[in-house]
């Protein structure tokens, strides 16, 4: 089935004659196909568009959600804007505050994916996620930086190597400040 690795083992099944009145013979066989899974990795940088070198961003946090488990996807309120599959822009204004994070499985037990926090090199890697489409949201934004838009990760292959790097740029906040100096006597 889709989303599973192919078990190439050849299994021997014995079917014996059970009489002329038996129209159907059933044999049970367990096949050990595994769900495809793969991690993804990212790196966070910060630049203002003026510099040639970028700063690595430590302490940025990301939460991972399985798209098919999101409330508005399940109840049909949110549909893919392109009519086929969800894109990052579909989740730009989505409220994730009441949603459950995605799960991965350890020995058959569902384990919530923890918040991914970038290290001092701006690097974070997810656990191996089961086959499916996920939306990743920046949940912790370091001080004085802008939060990046959500992005979509599609797990389609079975690999122990994380998906290639995704580089995200947290630009510093820019603002204008106007100072008006007033004289105490003239106002």
Locate the predicted segments by residue.
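Solvent-exposed loop/turn and edge beta-strand elements of beta-rich ligand-binding domains
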Residues: 1-187
């Amino acid at each position: 089935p889709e989303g599973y690795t192919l078990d190439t083992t050849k299994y021997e099944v014995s079917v014996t004659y059970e009489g002329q009145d038996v129209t159907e013979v059933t044999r049970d066989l367990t096949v050990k196909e595994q769900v495809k899974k793969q991690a993804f990795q990212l790196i966070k940088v910060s630049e203002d568009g003026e510099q040639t070198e970028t700063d690595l961003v430590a302490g940025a946090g990301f939460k991972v959600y399985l798209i098919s488990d999101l409330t508005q996807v399940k109840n049909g309120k949110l549909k893919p804007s392109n009519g086929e599959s969800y894109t990052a822009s579909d989740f730009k204004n989505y409220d994730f505050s009441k949603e459950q994070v995605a799960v991965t499985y350890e020995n058959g037990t569902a384990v919530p994916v923890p918040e991914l926090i970038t290290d001092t090199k701006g690097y974070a890697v997810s656990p191996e996620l089961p086959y499916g489409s996920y939306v990743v949201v920046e949940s912790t934004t370091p001080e004085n930086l802008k939060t990046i838009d959500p992005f979509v990760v599609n797990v389609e292959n079975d690999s122990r190597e994380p998906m290639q790097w995704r580089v995200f740029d947290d630009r510093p906040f820019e603002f204008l400040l106007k100072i008006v100096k007033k004289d105490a006597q003239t106002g």
